[in-house]
Amino acid sequence: MRQFSTNPYRQSPNQKFACSIANFKLYTVFPFSLPSSQVNISTFAFLFSEVVQYNQQRVTSLAQLHEKLADLGRHVGFRMIDLLCVRDRAPKRETRIVNILWFIQKTVWKTLFGKEADRLEQATATEATYYLFEDEPLVNKFVSVPKEQSSFNCAAFMAGTVEAFLCGVQFPCRVKAFLVKEQTTTAFEITFEDSVIERDKRLEANK
């Protein structure tokens, strides 16, 4: 596979974004005395670009590389559950699909990337599928992809994060990331298992 070129310093070195990949242990020990952790965006860019190149050298296809990045994202997603529970003195357990997706769009996204996800939509063809859209995801800003590998999307890492978070809070699903709108916007396709849809219908009927 042809290696991707990276530019971790494309953004200003002084620009920062909220990121909870680091310092989970510190928040577990001192949950209410520490400020929100922030990572310099250039540091994150350098680290993430190295992760992409490291995994690229150990796979033979883009599908395998996507799965490698998704696996790494899943580790973050599971830890986000613990982090947000520790930060919230009275955590609320969401039981409805729309509510948990709103929570991801707003709270989880802002905790990880310093902003809310751009929009959330439900598929018209099936009630089990939703789409979370992000215009120019942060992880895609630092990797230049060759034309012959234009389907590669670093946001597979973010898809793994969302999938693990949802599965960890009892909303089993599969999440895939793909590019739309001239390869700048990423859509995260969230497909819930039938058991989740059936539970949501029961809760709606018992309102």
Where are these regions (language model features)?
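N-terminal accessory segment detector
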Residues: M1-C154, E182, S195-K207
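Long, hydrophobic, amphipathic alpha-helical segments used as structural scaffolds
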Residues: L112, E116, V169-C173, A177
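Beta-strand elements of modular eukaryotic interaction domains
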Residues: R119-Q122, A164, K176-L179
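Mixed-charge, glycine-accented linear interaction segment located at domain edges/termini
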Residues: F157-P172
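Beta-rich nucleic-acid/ligand-interaction surfaces
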Residues: V175-E193
